[in-house]
A protein has these predicted regions:
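Periplasmic peptidoglycan-binding/anchoring modules of Gram-negative envelope and division proteins
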Residues: 118-150, 177, 207-209, 214, ...
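Bacterial N-terminal signal peptides that target proteins for export
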Residues: 1-10
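Short, solvent-exposed beta-strand/turn patches at coil↔beta or beta↔helix junctions
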Residues: 102-132, 152-159
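Solvent-exposed, polar/charged alpha-helical surfaces in well-ordered, non-transmembrane soluble domains
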Residues: 87, 91, 125, 129-136, ...
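Periplasmic OmpA-like peptidoglycan-binding domain that tethers envelope proteins to the cell wall
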Residues: 151-225
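Short, low-complexity, glycine-enriched hydrophobic/amphipathic alpha-helices that associate
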Residues: 25-88
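C-terminal motif of bacterial Sec signal peptides marking the signal peptidase cleavage site
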Residues: 18-22
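Amphipathic, membrane-active segments
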Residues: 82-113
C-alpha cells in the first residue's frame, strides 16, 4: 500500500484536559483503534477541528474524512470496517494510493488509473476499466458515502481549470452511478489547480497533479449499526 504522510499540528487546550491526537497518531494506530484514537468523549469535536485545519473548512479529501469522525467505541467499529474496505480497494486496483485516516479512506487515482481525453471530461477506456474494478467494492460497502474531487494542473486559466475539474469529477460520478451504485452516495467538487501534490513546472509534475481523489466516509446507516453493535 502506498502511503502519503500527513503533516498536521497537534491541537491543544480543547475541552479542558481532553487527550488529543495528531493525524500521524491516528494513522499509525492499530486497526480498530484508528477510530478510537480520535477520543471517546469528544471524537466528533476533535474531528471537526482537525478537518478544518486540513484546509478550506474540510473542503479537501483529507478534511472531509477527518472532519466526519464519530470517535469512541463506535468510531473503532467503523474504523475496522474501513480497514477491510481499504484492503479490498488496494487488491482491486494495485498501485493506487489508499490511505486510511481516522474513520475513513482517502483514495488518490492518478492519470495512470483514471484519465480523460485531452481538455475534456470524457473518460478513457483505461479509466473506465479501472473504475469497473472499484464497483464491486463500493457495492459491498454500500453504507458509505463518497465525495469525488477533481484536480488539474496549472496550465490554462484558473476558472477554466476549476470548471474542467468539476466536469471530470461529475463524469466519474456519472459513470459509477451507471454501474448500479446509488447516485445519492456521491457528491462532487472541482478543485481546479489547487492543492498540487507536485510542481507544475515539469511535465512529470503536471501529470501527477491531474488526478481524481475520493473521500470515503461512513453514512448514517453505518454509524447507527455501529452504535447498536457497541451496546451489545
Amino acid at each position: 500500500m502506498k502511503k502519503k504522510y500527513i503533516s498536521l499540528s497537534l491541537v491543544t487546550a480543547l475541552l479542558l484536559s481532553t487527550t488529543l491526537v495528531s493525524c500521524d497518531a491516528i494513522k499509525n494506530a492499530n486497526n480498530t483503534q484508528k477510530g478510537v484514537a480520535i477520543g471517546t468523549t469528544s471524537g466528533a469535536v476533535i474531528g471537526g477541528i482537525l478537518g478544518n485545519n486540513l484546509g478550506k473548512g474540510g473542503n479537501t479529501p483529507l478534511g472531509a474524512v477527518i472532519g466526519g469522525v464519530v470517535g469512541g467505541t463506535i468510531g473503532g467499529l467503523i474504523g475496522n470496517k474501513m480497514d477491510k474496505q481499504a484492503r479490498e480497494i488496494e487488491n482491486a486496483l494495485p498501485g493506487t494510493q489508499v490511505q486510511r485516516v481516522g474513520e475513513g479512506i482517502h483514495l488518490v487515482l492518478g492519470e495512470n488509473s483514471v484519465n480523460f481525453q485531452f481538455n475534456k471530461s470524457t473518460l478513457t477506456i483505461t479509466a473506465k476499466q479501472n473504475l469497473d474494478k472499484l464497483v464491486p467494492v463500493f457495492k459491498e460497502y454500500a453504507d458509505t458515502d463518497i465525495k469525488i474531487y477533481g484536480y488539474t494542473d496549472s496550465k490554462g486559466s484558473e476558472s477554466y481549470n476549476l470548471n474542467l475539474s468539476s466536469e471530470r469529477a461529475a463524469a466519474v460520478k456519472s459513470y459509477l452511478s451507471g454501474k448500479g451504485l446509488s447516485s445519492s452516495r456521491f457528491s462532487v467538487l472541482g478543485m481546479g489547480e489547487a492543492e498540487p501534490i507536485e510542481t507544475n513546472d515539469t511535465d512529470a509534475g503536471r501529470s501527477l497533479n491531474r488526478r481524481v481523489e475520493f473521500a470515503i466516509v461512513a453514512n448514517q446507516k453505518m454509524i447507527d449499526d455501529a452504535a447498536k453493535e457497541s451496546e451489545k
